[in-house]
Amino acid sequence: ATGLNFWETSTLNSSLASANGASATDASILALAPSSISQLDESNISASLMYYGVTTDYNIFGSETDYNTKNPIPMGFFVTPIDESYFFGLAIYSRTAADITVPTIPLVHPKETRVTPIMVSVSPSVAYKLNNVSFAVSLEYIHTPYALEQTTCFINLCNTLKQEGKTSGWAGALSTSWQITSSVSTALIHRFSASFGDENITVKLPSITSLYGAFAITPKTTLHATYSYSKFDGKGVTYANYQDPIGLLIGYQDSQRVATSIEHKIGRWSLRGGVSLDEAIDQLGGIDKRFRLGVGYMVTKHFTVNAALVNEDYAIKEAIAGEATLVKVQNNGKAFSLGGHYKF
């Protein structure tokens, strides 16, 4: 697994591989670099709905099992200038999520298990602009509904036990943006680690540092790039009643992410595309690749609609003894997102 980081924070951000933190187009810039909201001169509201699905194919000791999970994920953002120097933003989105099913493994994992820690962040930010540089402070409340489903079967009789609950915690971030020239800008954000939980679950989220750059090649074409470092070693989610034998919920190493994207405007249309590479945090490692396409259409000078497609190609996980493959796991994901933003 790449980890619990979820980078598909809005339709616009997904289509640009979340590499666009140095260049603000709408309020969803709050999910990347809140300091960049100083580039938005008017009050701005943005909303998206992503339909996200992952298929997982297991081959364990020659026994094949396939799983398919699908989840709708809503997000919303609001930004408003307070005066010429101060700006306020409010974000509601998910930057940390998982929905994983692990099949029965003889002698090792007798119960088929599904774990779904889905975390929703509510994050207000205040930004201050001084000439071409801006700074922002963000507070993050993380609401975490979770579930643990375990199924035990004997012959053709199966029994499923489900444990559900909610927990929450706090985190924060500092960010800065610099408009170097009219065509070049950069941004930097550091998200602090967080730790919280209850008697059933312990959540330890990593600190994340991200650097963004944007370069306007022409007045209508912009290139975006980003690098992120997540300190995932030893961080993740632990269930009191689940041992995680494959190691999908806890990081064994830190993770680096690189992404780049491009946006070109033609009349009322915006054409977007991007690619991102993430280091997997599990024991076997590998690179998870994601490819994106997106389009935007300016319906009026105030209202724009966006659409995005994401295709995920995860690194194959294999445990081999001699010439025999003991365990093989292959994940593939697809997402479709539709959203819009309105400038007041």
Report each predicted region and the residues it spans:
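Outer-membrane beta-barrel porins/channels
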Residues: 2-14, 60-61, 70-344
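Transmembrane beta-strand segments of Gram-negative outer membrane beta-barrel proteins
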Residues: 5-18, 38-55
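Surface-exposed strand-loop-strand hairpins of Gram-negative outer-membrane beta-barrel proteins
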Residues: 18-25, 53-70
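A broadly conserved detector of short glycine/acidic/proline-rich loop/turn motifs that flank catalytic sites
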Residues: 20, 51, 309-311
